[in-house]
Amino acid sequence: MSKKRLHEIAKEIGKSSKEVVEHAKYLGLDVKSHASSVEEADAKKIISSFSKASKPDVTASQTVKPKEVAQPSVTVVKETGSEHVEKTQVSKPKSRNFKAEREARAKEQAARKQANGSSHRSQERRGGYRQPNNHQTNEQGDKRITHRSQGDTNDKRIERKASNVSPRHDNHQLVGDRNRSFAKENHKNGRFTNQKKQGRQEPQSKSPKIDFKARAAALKAEQNAEYSRQSETRFRAQQEAKRLAELARQEAKEAALKAQAEEMSHREAALKSIEEAETKLKSSNISAKSTADNRRKKQARPEKNRELTHHSQEGQKKNKKSWNSQNQVRNQKNSNWNKNKKTKKGKNAKNTNTAPKPVTERKFHELPKEFEYTEGMTVAEIAKRIKREPAEIVKKLFMMGVMATQNQSLDGDTIELLMVDYGIEAKAKVEVDDADIERFFEDENYLNPENIVERAPVVTIMGHVDHGKTTLLDTLRNSRVATGEAGGITQHIGAYQIEEAGKKITFLDTPGHAAFTSMRARGASVTDITILIVAADDGVMPQTIEAINHSKAAGVPIIVAINKIDKPGANPERVIAELAEYGIISTAWGGECEFVEISAKFNKNIDELLETVLLVAEVEELKADPTVRAIGTVIEARLDKGKGAIATLLVQQGTLHVQDPIVVGNTFGRVRAMVNDLGRRVKSAEPSTPVSITGLNETPMAGDHFAVYADEKAARAAGEERSKRALLKQRQNTQRVSLDNLFDTLKAGEIKTVNVIIKADVQGSVEALAASLVKIEVEGVRVNVVHSAVGAINESDVTLAEASNAVIIGFNVRPTPQARQQADTDDVEIRLHSIIYKVIEEVEEAMKGKLDPVYQEKILGEAIIRETFKVSKVGTIGGFMVINGKVTRDSSVRVIRDSVVIFDGKLASLKHYKDDVKEVGNAQEGGLMIENFNDLKVDDTIEAYIMEEIVRK
C-alpha cells in the first residue's frame, strides 16, 4: 500500500502542516513532523477528521452549541423573521482593550441575569470559544454558579474539561495552550455566566442557524491582525535590543580602553621602580666584588691568574678555575631574563584583564521570494544564497528523510522540495551556451521589430554543366570571367552584387559539375530566390534535376531561365514540358514558377529576368535588422600565402564592421580587413552583402555560420570551446576494435586502400575532390583521404605522405621549392591538376593498379625423359626430348608419372648438349635438373608452364 507524507495531505485539503500533524497525533498515529509518512487508510482518517471538524453532523449540533464570541471587528446583519444570515464584512483590525471589553461583558451579563430572573448554564468554555451543550441541565448550571467563587477549583475544572472535550470538536482544541490561558482569564473575569445572549430565550428549534464559516473567517482575520501586530512589536523590540546592545558594546569598549590605559600607567611605574632597584643591586654587587677581590689579593701569594684558582681547597677542586665572576654575570643575565619575563606576564595580563567582547547577534535576513537554482548545488551554496545556516538546512533535509552534509550536492527535486518548505518559489536556471552560434539564427527575440528594414534578395544561379550560368553572371557584371574557367567549370562559389532600378541584388554562382553537389546545396540554403538555367537545345539534364531538388528542399521560389534561345536547335516548349514532369510548372500553364527566355551570350531579355527577380523578392517581403550584431554564413574559404586565412561571408542579419570580434565555425578572430566583390576595401557590410575578410586564426569550413560577439575575450572563449567540441566529436566517431566489430575489421583488412592527400586553392574544391574520390567504385579498393586542406603544398604535407605512403594531389596549387626538393629526396609522388574529372580518372587508374594481380596458367610444352644420369654432389640429370611445344629456362615444371603429378617445381638448369640454353624447342633433345628433386625415372612426363597476369578492364 502506498504512503503519503503529511505535507502532501495538507496541500490536498488546504490546511497547514501543523494542523495536520496535530490531528494525526490526536488520532493516535506515530508521526513526528510534516515529512512523516502514513498509510493511505490513515490519510483518509485524517482527511475525514477535518471534514467532520469543519461540518458537524446533526448529533453534534444537538449535543454542543457553539458560543458566540464578541468580535468588534466583525459585523453580522440578520434579517427579521428569517434564519438567513448575511455575508460577514471584515473591517480593518484595530488595537483592542481586552480587559475593558471583558468588564463590559461581565456587567452586561449581570444586567441580563437580573432582567430575565432565571439563569441557565448553557455554555461551556473550550479553548477560548463558547459551545452550546444540551446535556447540561439548569441544575448543573446552578451548581457551577455556586462554585464560581472557588477560583482555583474552577480553573482546574476548566482545564480538565478542555482536555476531555468530545473529539467532534478537535478543530477548537487545536488552538492550544494559548486558548486555555484565555479560558482561565475569562473565567476569573466573570465571563462564565449562565445567561444566554439577547434573542436566545426562545426554544432551540426556533433559534437561527449560526454561520460557522463567517465566524471562522472573522476569527482568522482577527488572528492575522493580531499576528501582524505581534510581528511588528517583535521587530521593534529586536531593533531596540540591537540598539541597546550596540550602546552596551560601545560602553564596554570605552571601559576596556580606560582600564587598559590605567594598567599601562601602573605597569610603567612598576617597571621604573624595578629598574631603580636593579641599579641599586648592581652597584652593591660591584662594591662587594671589589672588596672581596682586595681581600683575596692580600691573602694569596703573588701568582699569575691567582684570582681564578682555589689553593685553599682540598681534593679535585684544588687549583681549578673560580667561576664567581662568571656566575655573577649569569645572575645578572637571569635578572634581566626575569625582568623580561615579568614584562611578558604583564602583557599577558593586559590581554586577560581586558573586558570580553560582547557576542554579536546574527542579523535577521528576510527570505527571498524566488530562488534560481542549478542542478548539483551544495547545501552550503544554498545556505549562502538564502542567508541561512547550513546546519539549519541539513536539519530540514533530515526531517524530510534526506541525509546530507553541507558539502553534498543536491538534485533538482530535492532543492525544489526544500524551497517549498521555506515558502520560496524555486526556478531552474536556464544555462545559455555562449559557444552555440545557432541560437542567434533560431532566437526570434534577437531582432528588434522596430528596426526591421527591407533587404536585398540573395539569388543563386543553378543548372547543368555548360548551360550558361557563369556567362549569365558575366553578362550581368559586364565582365568576362567565364572564359578563364578551366574546362568550362566554375571551381568555387562566387558572390557578386549588382544594382537594378535602384535596388541591389546579390548573386551566388554555383558549379554545375556532379562533384560540387555539396556546394550547390550550400548555395541553396542561404538563398532567397533560385534561378534555374536550362539550355534550350539540351533540355533537362541530371544536374538540373539535382538543382530542382535542392531548391525544393530549401523552400525557395524558382525562376526558370531558358538560355541559348539563339541557337538553331533551341526548343523552349520542350524544356517547359520536361520541367513540368518534375513539378516546375509555368504560370502560363497555371503553375507558380516564372519562365523567362533569354540569351546570355547576346544579352537578350536580361532586363526582363532582373525585373522578375525584383517582383518575386517584393512578394517574399525580405526583411532584416541592421542594428544587431552581424550573423551569417561562410560562402567560401581559402588560405593565402601572404594574408593568411581568407573567408567569403554573406551577412544575413545585422551589420559587420572592421575590428569586430567574430567566431566563424570552429575558429575565431577579429575582422582585420573587408573587401567587397569589386575588390575595394569597405568598413562595414549590411545585410545581404558578400564580403571577404581576413584576421581569422584558422581557415573555416565553407557553409559554417558566423556571429559577432561583444568582446574579443568572449569570442576567443566561444571559438576555443567549439574547437574542443569538434575535436571530441571527431574522436568519438573513430571506431575502436571490439568483439562486436572484430569480424568486420578483419574483413576490411582484406580491402586495399589508396592513401591520398588533397591540397586545393579553396575549401569548396577540397570538399568536392574528397567526396568524388570516396565515391569511386573499384571492387576491393577504396580511397582513404589522409589529409585535406587549402593552400600550397609544403614540407609537412610531404612528410605526412612519406609516413602514410600517400599520393599528394594538388588542385590549382603548386608545391613550394622546399617541398618539391623534399619530395624528390623521399620519393613522394605529387600530382598537380586544374580539372576535376582528370583527377578522378587518374585516381581510378591507380586504384585498379593497387589490386593484387590475377594470374592464369599457360602450358608451354611437354617432354619425355629418355635417360637418367646420377652425378655425385650434383644430383640426377634427366635426358629428355620435347614432344610438344617448348621448355624454357624460367618456366615451372610438373613431373607426371602414370598420370599423377608427383612434383611441381622450378628448373635448376637446362642444357642442349653441353651448352646452357634459355629454351629447347619441339622435337629437340636436352638435359635438365629440377630443384630439390632427384627421383627422375625413364618415361616420366615433364610439363612446362608459366603463370601469366590477366589485365583488369
UniProtKB/Swiss-Prot annotation:
Region spans: G2: 488-492
Chain intervals for the UniProt region annotation (G4): 563-566
PROSITE patterns: G_TR_2, IF2
Residue positions binding GTP: 463-470, 509-513, 563-566
Biased composition annotated in UniProt, kind: Basic and acidic residues: 80-89, 98-111, 140-188, 300-317
Basic residues: bias regions: 339-348
Subcellular localization(s) per the UniProt record: Cytoplasm
Keyword Cytoplasm: yes
Xref: InterPro entries: EF-G-like_DII, IF2_II, IF2_N, P-loop_NTPase, Small_GTP-bd, T_Tr_GTP-bd_dom, TF_IF2_bacterial-like, TIF_IF2
GO molecular function annotations of the record: GTP binding; GTPase activity; translation initiation factor activity
Residue ranges of the region described as Disordered: 48-212, 279-367
Chain positions covered by the region annotation G1: 463-470
Composition-biased stretches (Low complexity): 322-338
PANTHER family named in the record: TR-TYPE G DOMAIN-CONTAINING PROTEIN (PTHR43381:SF5), TRANSLATION INITIATION FACTOR IF-2-RELATED (PTHR43381)
Function: One of the essential components for the initiation of protein synthesis. Protects formylmethionyl-tRNA from spontaneous hydrolysis and promotes its binding to the 30S ribosomal subunits. Also involved in the hydrolysis of GTP during the formation of the 70S ribosomal complex.
Family affiliation: Belongs to the TRAFAC class translation factor GTPase superfamily. Classic translation factor GTPase family. IF-2 subfamily.
Name of the molecule in the record: Translation initiation factor IF-2
Organism: Streptococcus pyogenes serotype M3 (strain ATCC BAA-595 / MGAS315)
